[in-house]
From Swiss-Prot:
Entry's localization field: Cell membrane
Organism: Aquifex aeolicus (strain VF5)
Residue runs in coiled coils: none
Keyword Transmembrane helix attached: yes
Record protein name field: Uncharacterized protein aq_453
Transmembrane parts of this sequence: 30-52, 88-105, 126-148, 161-183, 190-212, 222-244
Keyword vocabulary terms for this entry: Cell membrane, Membrane, Transmembrane, Transmembrane helix
Membrane topology annotation: Multi-pass membrane protein
GO CC terms: plasma membrane
InterPro entries noted in UniProt: Virul_fac_BrkB
Length: 257
């Protein structure tokens, strides 16, 4: 019972902190940065996939489609068109894409340092320029592996659907855990795991709610639904970044309680 009380107390305090210190500002900044960097990041990944065979952009697209709300897939499809440019991109455009991508990771680190305050990890500049591509390659590898594992689970364990859903979610869990581990001083691994799974759970719930809403809007008016899709997509991204920052604050609150 003491552990549950500790968890609920940390959860309440991190939500209160998010309201007091207006984490929505940093979530909005991260949303804007991501929109600016998505196309360059995909161009860089497309070029990287030509050298590393296990990087499959099609699998990444499947993961995105599965975890993004329905009716926003058209936005993803437009963004993913940038992958065609990556196959013929010049060295200069690749360097520019890489520069923008690294700056986005720096922005994540800066936002997390604001949220976790005393538990921020001092990261050397070299980490951003060298560690980022390594993280990107690992994320692509985990994406490919989780995709094939989810297919196997669907084939041999048809009655246990949550196993395949969990397997397909591994890339996102891996990414959240990796970012927290890279920029936050973790004293107890249990706090990292609890926080990451809470972020995943509420992100999944958020996706479900947004999917229901977009389906409802499209039923009422296709024109209105089409016009509101992009706005909903931005809003959904913003809420997910807010969850990510609250999850980081949860780690500090849980370990200090």
């Amino acid at each position: 019972m003491g552990t549950l009380r500790k968890l609920l107390n940390a959860l309440f305090l991190c939500l209160w902190d998010a309201f007091r210190y207006d984490y929505s500002y940093h979530a909005s900044a991260l949303t804007l940065q991501l929109l600016l960097v998505l196309a360059p990041l995909i161009v860089f990944l497309a070029a990287l996939s030509s050298y590393l065979g296990f990087i499959k952009l099609d699998l990444l697209e499947e993961v995105l489609r599965e975890h993004f709300p329905k009716q926003t897939h058209a936005v993803i499809a437009e963004i993913l068109k940038a992958k065609e440019q990556g196959k013929t991109a010049s060295l200069i455009s690749l360097l520019v894409s890489y520069f923008f991508s690294v700056n986005f990771v720096k922005k994540i680190a800066k936002s997390l340092s604001y949220v976790v305050e005393r538990k921020k990890r001092d990261v050397h500049e070299v980490f951003f320029w060298v560690g980022f591509p390594i993280l990107l390659v690992l994320f692509s590898f985990v994406t490919g592996m989780s995709f094939y594992v989810s297919i196997l689970l669907k084939t041999y364990f048809k009655g246990i659907g949550f196993l395949s859903n969990l397997a397909s979610s591994l890339p996102l869990l891996f990414l959240v855990i990796s970012l927290y581990w890279s920029f936050i001083k973790i004293n107890r691994k249990i706090s990292l795991l609890i926080s990451s799974f809470l972020v995943y759970f509420f992100a999944s719930l958020l996706q479900y709610i947004f999917t229901l809403y977009t389906v409802y809007v499209f039923k009422g008016s296709v024109l209105y639904g089409s016009l509101s899709t992009i706005v909903l997509f931005f809003l959904w991204l913003n809420f997910n970044f807010l969850l990510f920052l609250v999850g980081a604050r949860f780690i500090e609150r849980y370990e200090s309680s």
